[in-house]
Amino acid sequence: ICRRFDPDRIAAIKEQYGHSVFITCGKSAYLNNIQIDNYDGTIFTTSGINIIATANATVVQLPVETFDTHNYLAASDTIIAKAGWGTISEALLSKRNLVLIEREGVLEDTENIEELKRRGVAVSIKESNLARIDMQAINELIAENIVREHLDAYHNAMGDIIREL
């Protein structure tokens, strides 16, 4: 289950910004800055994170009042995020590359990450490696571990649940 995507809005975001990465860590990330290396495109980020891009990338800080962050997520090629179920659902249902942040001692995140990796629908990086992210290495990790066909198993069950109620 996730918020309803707006295909027209997603297409408009893709047209305006081109290839993109969506990074959201919330306020629980211990870093003030994240450096992104080897990426040409747009980097969408949410409040609480300062992104420094070393290549020919454009950083777009989404205002806290952005009501449709899920459409930006769905318009992006890759999502780097904490392992909360809202973001996981949106990433899986939009069939995006999902890179989850391993946070030591957060058992629910660890269990989510391990299960999604086992299913071949996500990869992970350690929170301690967030200070500097090499997108070339991330893309290689994705290519080696995410099985695109496995993403087809997921659909938004909101309608099914409403019918049951």
What is the predicted function of each stretch?
Residues 3-78:
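Donor-nucleotide binding loops and adjacent catalytic segments primarily
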Residues 39-40, 125-132, 149-152:
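Catalytic-core helical/loop segments in enzymes performing group transfer/polymerization on anionic/lipid-linked
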Residues 62, 81, 151-154:
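A conditional alpha-helix N-cap/helix-loop micro-motif detector
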